[in-house]
UniProtKB/Swiss-Prot annotation:
Presence of the UniProt keyword Flavoprotein in the record: no
Record organism: Aspergillus clavatus (strain ATCC 1007 / CBS 513.65 / DSM 816 / NCTC 3887 / NRRL 1 / QM 1276 / 107)
SUPFAM superfamilies assigned: P-loop containing nucleoside triphosphate hydrolases (SSF52540)
GO annotation, biological process: endonucleolytic cleavage in ITS1 upstream of 5.8S rRNA from tricistronic rRNA transcript (SSU-rRNA, 5.8S rRNA, LSU-rRNA)
One GO CC term on file: nucleolus
Domain Helicase ATP-binding, residue spans: 116-292
Protein name (database record): ATP-dependent RNA helicase dbp3
Main localization (coarse): nucleus
Sequence motif DEAD box, residues: 239-242
Keyword annotations: ATP-binding, Helicase, Hydrolase, Nucleotide-binding, Nucleus, Ribosome biogenesis, RNA-binding, rRNA processing
InterPro entries, alphabetized: DEAD/DEAH_box_helicase_dom, Helicase_ATP-bd, Helicase_C-like, P-loop_NTPase, RNA-helicase_DEAD-box_CS
Primary role: ATP-dependent RNA helicase required for 60S ribosomal subunit synthesis. Involved in efficient pre-rRNA processing, predominantly at site A3, which is necessary for the normal formation of 25S and 5.8S rRNAs.
Assigned protein family: Belongs to the DEAD box helicase family. DDX5/DBP2 subfamily.
Residue ranges with Basic and acidic residues bias: 1-13
């Protein structure tokens, strides 16, 4: 028999103010001292049974796993602690068809290992991890198991059991593609809702969907016209929460959440960063949430994936496109001819010009930027994923969230507006444990970013070229000449402005 773990924190599980002598936050993931069986009260009926093999594992092995993968789990409640699910064999019992697709993976990723036991146990969870960390399956598997355990997998009247909110249509489609594979194997229907297409087919799909993956703007629209009722939602996910706030969707998110049942809802938030604006949002709708952090301090300076070899070349502005053609020619020949290369530009017009240039040079190229319609964007992404195009020219609309497998190289033709965007861009390579490469063409125009870039390079133990050091190591205030001090923490007391072009 395994250990049965769940939690009872009373009817009111809202965060409480810290008392003077309150004990400090505890880092969890040690094993409970004895078998514990407690129900969740009104919040959830979830019960998690920890595998006996996992329970018998020496604590030293658990500690080593947490340290090796830089996993920190912080829980301020008195709930029993649970151990990370290190192997798929440690998963709680469920329909074997749900787990069968996992055989293609060697083991859970760190974010999956740490969040699965908590989510299976019905806890509210905040996951802080880099993109490409396996978070879709981290929140997706517990979601599907929760629906299976409820005994109801057929739904009608547009009353879904689970809602997953994503900042962009591309990311929503990507999540849907992964979730639907697992859901379909056990007879659960999922649908994807986003802007830029007609609503009629979406309304029809909503009628029988158990899981809705959606962008906030379109979901809010369909709510307003009565096409979907969120009153039965028991599992709510906010993916890329920091990015949704950046894009001005805070009020839409709050409106959507307020229409779901607080007393029965399990809430999950995933974010790459942890600024005050995201913390404030979490505090308004999550109860006694456990925070799982993979890597360093998310509120500190941005850090690049250490598996990515970063190269910075200081060039003249007028030489950038010539150098880009050289780099592609050097990196797409012989055995590497089919390697996927992601090329980033700063503006739409620049991206369109670079795409035309590369096409004229006979590269197999596709593009993705804000001027393309829905069909054109999906067509470009599909071409790149399938290998029909080996070069994808993108603006920052593709910098975060998009899961494009096997990108070997990222080339930054123009440095982004912030070093955070730089880290997100190059994070398209070196995913799922693979090695990656990133080459950045840096010009005198970008010199205000030199100090921050040097810090990122040093933190990842990468070579810093002397030409870059000449621009200085001072970290400037986060602002851009054309946009001013646009990069400010969101004021949680003010309503955000919705940007509609990407939803």
């Amino acid at each position: 028999m395994g250990k049965r773990v769940s939690h009872n924190e009373g009817a009111d599980r809202r965060p409480k103010k810290k008392a003077k002598n309150e004990k400090p936050e505890k880092e969890t993931m040690e094993s409970p001292a004895a078998d514990v069986t407690v129900d969740f009260g009104s919040k959830s009926d979830a019960t998690y049974v920890q595998s006996q093999v996992l329970s018998d594992m020496p604590q030293s092995e658990i500690d080593q796993f947490l340290a090796t993968h830089s996993i920190k789990v912080t829980d301020t409640s008195d709930a029993p602690a649970v151990r990370p699910i290190i192997s798929f064999s440690h998963l709680p019992s469920c329909d074997s068809k749900l787990y069968s697709s996992l055989s293609s993976f060697a083991s859970p990723t760190p974010i999956q290992s740490a969040t699965w036991p908590l989510l299976f146990a019905g806890r509210d969870v905040i996951g802080i991890a880099e993109t490409g960390s396996g978070k879709t399956l981290a929140f997706g598997l517990p979601c599907l198991k929760k629906i299976l355990d409820s005994g109801k997998i057929k739904f009608k009247n547009a009353r879904p059991a689970a809602v997953i909110i994503s900042p962009t249509r591309e990311l929503a489609m990507q999540i849907y593609d992964q979730i639907s594979k697992y859901a379909g194997s056990i007879g659960i229907k999922a649908t994807c809702i986003f802007g830029g297409v007609k609503k009629d087919e979406q309304r029809e799909a909503l009628k029988s969907a158990a899981i809705v993956v959606a962008t906030p703007g379109r979901l809010k629209d369909l709510q307003n016209d009565g096409s979907v009722d969120l009153g039965k939602v028991k599992y709510l996910v906010l993916d890329e929460a920091d990015r949704m706030l950046d894009k001005g969707f805070e009020q839409d998110i709050k409106d959507i959440i307020s229409s779901t049942p607080d007393s029965k809802r399990q809430t999950v938030m995933f974010t790459a960063t942890w600024p005050p604006s995201v913390r404030d949002l979490a505090a308004t709708f999550m109860t006694s949430a456990v925070t799982v952090t993979i890597g360093g301090d998310p509120s500190a300076d941005p850090r690049a994936n250490t598996r990515i070899k970063q190269t910075v070349e200081v060039v003249q502005s007028h030489d950038k496109e010539y150098r880009l053609v050289q780099l592609l020619s050097e990196n797409q020949r012989g055995a590497a001819a089919l390697d996927k290369v992601l090329v980033f530009c700063l503006y739409k017009k620049e991206a369109m010009r670079v795409e035309r240039l590369l096409r004229n040079k006979n590269f197999k190229v596709a593009g993705i930027h804000g001027d393309l319609n829905q069909h054109e964007r999906f067509k470009s992404l599909d071409a790149f994923k399938s290998g029909a195009a080996t070069v994808l020219v993108a603006t920052d609309v593709a910098a975060r969230g998009l899961d494009i497998p096997s990108v070997k190289l990222v080339i930054n033709v123009t440095f982004p507006l912030t070093v955070e965007d730089y880290v997100h861009r190059i994070g398209r390579t070196g995913r799922a444990g693979a090695e990656g490469r990133a080459i950045t063409l840096f010009t005198e125009t970008d010199k205000a970013q030199s100090g921050a870039l040097i810090n990122v390079l040093k933190a990842a133990k990468q070579e810093v070229p002397q030409e870059l050091l000449k621009f200085g190591t001072t970290v400037k205030k986060k602002q851009h000449g054309a946009y001013g001090a646009f990069f400010k923490e969101a004021d949680s007391g003010k309503s955000a402005t919705k940007i509609v072009f990407d939803d």
